[in-house]
Amino acid sequence: MKYREIADGIFVDRPNRFIAHVEMNGAVETVHVKNTGRCKELLLPGTAVRLEVSDNPKRKTKYDLVAVHKQGLGWVNMDSQAPNKVVGEWLAKQGYDYIKPEFTYGKSRIDFYMEKGEQKYLMEVKGCTLEVDGIGYFPDAPTERGVKHLHELAQAQRTGYQCAVAFVIQMEGITEVRPNVSTQPEFGTALAEAKAAGVRVLFLLCRVGRDSLEIVEQREG
């Protein structure tokens, strides 16, 4: 996936989940943050950030904060909408006969439903931006929705679907994602139960470009 236009800035602070102050060309701009997660380990004062320039002249903010430079690691795409977009592009190249985003299963909306011949597939997508000592972790904050999705995938797997949870690693140099049990042990339990039911765990490694994010490799978890 590609962004329309990218500008550079320096992170100043984040008054709330939705906006941040960024220094650009000597002035401080209020920008929209495309990730409502905490991201405290990423958004440090003085850190270089990348922003997508909005093409909507009626918007209150001209920019969306989409990437941040992490010392010792490199650029991290922190756009929470990017994982589903890149997976959608990637799935289109995987030989499926039919792909439907936002598929209702049980009491959840699963990110992707696919068909190949007679086989039906479900895939839930999770974006990973948290890195500790060269390992990716998910979630960076408790997510009851994420736990619920894993239970739904395990149930679907038992009824004949081929199911997978795909972790999109939104940074380079990281090849695996582990459940962040220190933040939410329930997610780790649900992931283990899903794997035991036959749900595949995929790590999707990405190339983080200045104005792009692209899946370059798939690994099994």
Name the predicted role of every residue range.
Residues Q170-G221:
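Domain-level recognition of nuclease-like catalytic cores that cleave nucleotide substrates
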Residues A27-E41:
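Beta-strand/loop nucleic-acid-binding surfaces
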Residues G9, I110-D140, L153:
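Conserved catalytic cores of phosphodiester-cleaving nucleases, focusing on short active-site segments
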Residues L44-N56, L205-C206:
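Flexible glycine-rich surface loops and low-complexity tracts that mediate binding to linear polymers
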Residues N16-H21:
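Short aromatic-glycine-enriched beta-strand elements
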Residues G134-E144, A154-T183, L205:
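Nucleic-acid nuclease catalytic cores
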Residues K40, Q71-P101:
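Acidic-basic catalytic patches of nuclease active cores, encompassing PD-(D/E)XK
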Residues G37-R50, A154:
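Short nucleic-acid-contacting surface segments enriched for D/E, G, S/T with interspersed K/R
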